[in-house]
Amino acid sequence: MTRIKSNWKFLLFVLLSGLVGGYCTGLYLPATFSSEMMQQLQEQGVTNELLVLSTMIQYGILYGVVLAAIGVVISRKVYLWKEFGFDKKGVAATAFISVVAALILFPGDKMVFGRFNSWVHDQYNVPPGLPKIISGLLVGGVIEEVMMRLFLMSLLVLIISILFYRHAEKVPTGVFVIANIVSALLFAAGHIPATMAMTELTPLLLFRCFLFNGGFGLCFGYLYRKYGIGYAMIAHGLAHLISDLLMIVAVSI
């Protein structure tokens, strides 16, 4: 009964995070679209209100609570599920990954890739508004971790285990590593459509997408495997929050 109650609390948390994060995403998303994308949406009759509603359903229900429920079941089956609790090493690893990832996003991204691409450079000239900050915390920190780590990474571990280690007493560490790498690459690839909606996709931006998101994904996957999905969520969310706050300070100076 305790386990069921714990799962329901987690699923409720994911649902609320997805609904609020989806709402905030729908609010700021139109401002990031290219003129061509906005014209396509207008031609299809997609209003701002409809966009907000669709992002709420998408992140709250489809990508959120549905995948979270499946992910909990699978992660328990492959022994990846860990109840959230204080872990000194987990806190230290999460803090380190969060700060490093945040600094890579800002000012790192602007200083490196911003020199070669005006679109990247311009992303850091405007301070993020409250909807974008909340979206980074909840959609990035919670929903993306549900999708890519709790669900996808766990599913990959299960599939590989069934195919190659059906009679093994326990899942080899290499299976978790492979699943983490594949899910990180897919996590990076999942950001390509969003980039294409905002600007022209160039080889440089493609490399940047896989370098940043793939690298971050590996780190979040490590936290998930070692300390549980809660620590992966915290690291992902904090990376967005810290980089956003640094950007606000830098722009206001």
Tell me the role of every PLM-derived stretch.
Residues 15-36, 105-110, 114:
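Alpha-helical transmembrane segments of multi-pass membrane proteins
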